[in-house]
Amino acid sequence: MHSQAPIQRRKSTRIYVGNVPIGDGAPIAVQSMTNTRTTDVEATVNQIKALERVGADIVRVSVPTMDAAEAFKLIKQRVNVPLVADIHFDYRIALKVAEYGVDCLRINPGNIGNEERIRMVVDCARDKNIPIRIGVNAGSLEKDLQEKYGEPTPQALLESAMRHVDHLDRLNFDQFKVSVKASDVFLAVESYRLLAKQIDQPLHLGITEAGGARSGAVKSAIGLGLLLSEGIGDTLRVSLAADPVEEIKVGFDILKSLRIRSRGINFIACPTCSRQEFDVIGTVNALEQRLEDIITPMDVSIIGCVVNGPGEALVSTLGVTGGNKKSGLYEDGVRKDRLDNNDMIDQLEARIRAKASQLDEARRIDVQQVEK
């Protein structure tokens, strides 16, 4: 499709997590978090590499102990994606992973210790050019805020976040991003809206503890979709009680749906009815699995009959319109060929791969011309 999302991004400052730019108009980064034991180096490395393969820009790793910090050192040496260390309570762990090359520290200054310990962590981060993420969560609000507000509210999450921001401001440290997560969609959305008006730093979006693969994806799509459509958000994580790989896939699907950032194929497919001339559902499911390695952005419409098929094909990179025994194949809105319905999956996979190669080559040539 050629339509552009009419979304004006919120202006924010720029930080870098490793080599990934965050904020100030940079592409919205998609991240996940490992759910292995960090001390199990092999399992953690394997999971991070699986996340890399599906396009993760950043991966967060929990580092709850010094043993985990030593494991983090080995993990960092074996992966390419930037790593965020998730640390609570023990400032010494933050200092240790900073020594081992961490790309970002996820901490709350308020639970890392007294002012001197906070200063030590911030000074270390400044010296090593390591950004910090302040992570506020409705499930772990400070006791006095729970008593003040009675329950998690947008104002409570905002007040908690601003306390931590003030900690860093007093230390003249501005290389940070902030999140204010909640499992309730409306609580999270309103909290982010309030925070976006208060600070200029990048915001990391998430609906925390969203649920299983299906319900969590729905909650995240609604909550993150609302914020992203308003231009709020610089990084995101879809939190699912599922394989972390699914978090990355859903994250990119949300961005693709809003036309904010595209990676891989955007399949447009009908829900099918008795008019379908070939197995649309089986075709789409098979192609989604077979073509996971394709990162070239393109729209592929797979429609089972001639009612909506031609119209969708006109605005797709490639489109199939169901027909009797053979279906029409469109490329860039022009009908090019007919595909045998009994061999649809193999034929369409070959055409999509060929088109992806063609688009990649065209982009490579464009880049070379710009660089000359």
UniProtKB/Swiss-Prot annotation:
**Superkingdom, taxonomy of origin:** Bacteria
EC number from the UniProt entry: 1.17.7.3
Q: Pathway, according to UniProt?
A: Isoprenoid biosynthesis; isopentenyl diphosphate biosynthesis via DXP pathway; isopentenyl diphosphate from 1-deoxy-D-xylulose 5-phosphate: step 5/6
The record, for Gene3D superfamilies, names:
Dihydropteroate synthase-like (3.20.20.20), Sulfite Reductase Hemoprotein, domain 1 (3.30.413.10)
Which source organism does the UniProt entry give? Shigella dysenteriae serotype 1 (strain Sd197)
Biological role stated in the UniProt entry: Converts 2C-methyl-D-erythritol 2,4-cyclodiphosphate (ME-2,4cPP) into 1-hydroxy-2-methyl-2-(E)-butenyl 4-diphosphate.
The cofactor required is:
[4Fe-4S] cluster
Renumbered to this chain, the signal peptide range is none
One Pfam family per UniProt: GcpE
Q: How is the cofactor bound?
A: Binds 1 [4Fe-4S] cluster.
Keywords for this protein:
4Fe-4S, Iron, Iron-sulfur, Isoprene biosynthesis, Metal-binding, Oxidoreductase
InterPro entries documented for this protein? Dihydropteroate_synth-like_sf, IspG_bac, IspG_bac-typ, NO2/SO3_Rdtase_4Fe4S_sf
> Can you name this protein?
4-hydroxy-3-methylbut-2-en-1-yl diphosphate synthase (flavodoxin)
Which reactions does this protein catalyse?
(2E)-4-hydroxy-3-methylbut-2-enyl diphosphate + oxidized [flavodoxin] + H2O + 2 H(+) = 2-C-methyl-D-erythritol 2,4-cyclic diphosphate + reduced [flavodoxin]
GO biological process entries: isopentenyl diphosphate biosynthetic process, methylerythritol 4-phosphate pathway; terpenoid biosynthetic process
PANTHER family associated with the record? 4-HYDROXY-3-METHYLBUT-2-EN-1-YL DIPHOSPHATE SYNTHASE (PTHR30454), 4-HYDROXY-3-METHYLBUT-2-EN-1-YL DIPHOSPHATE SYNTHASE (FERREDOXIN), CHLOROPLASTIC (PTHR30454:SF0)
